[in-house]
């Protein structure tokens, strides 16, 4: 399951992300954070952490460096 989710994120990074404006307020980017979280915590907890990160990545957030 981990590899499947990571593959989906990499497909997003390769095909969808280049068509969108750069808007991530954090480093690493939200998609890179998601991959790192899934690798570190597994599919369930890593995905939940990634979703929480994506919800925090908005115009009202200061952003900054945030590693999983």
From Swiss-Prot:
It is found in: Cell inner membrane. Keywords: Cell inner membrane, Cell membrane, Membrane. Could be involved in insertion of integral membrane proteins into the membrane. It holds the Pfam family YidD. Transmembrane segments: none annotated. Belongs to the UPF0161 family. It is a peripheral membrane protein. This is Putative membrane protein insertion efficiency factor. Its main location: membrane. One of its GO terms (cellular component) is plasma membrane. It comes from the Bacteria. It comes from Persephonella marina (strain DSM 14350 / EX-H1).
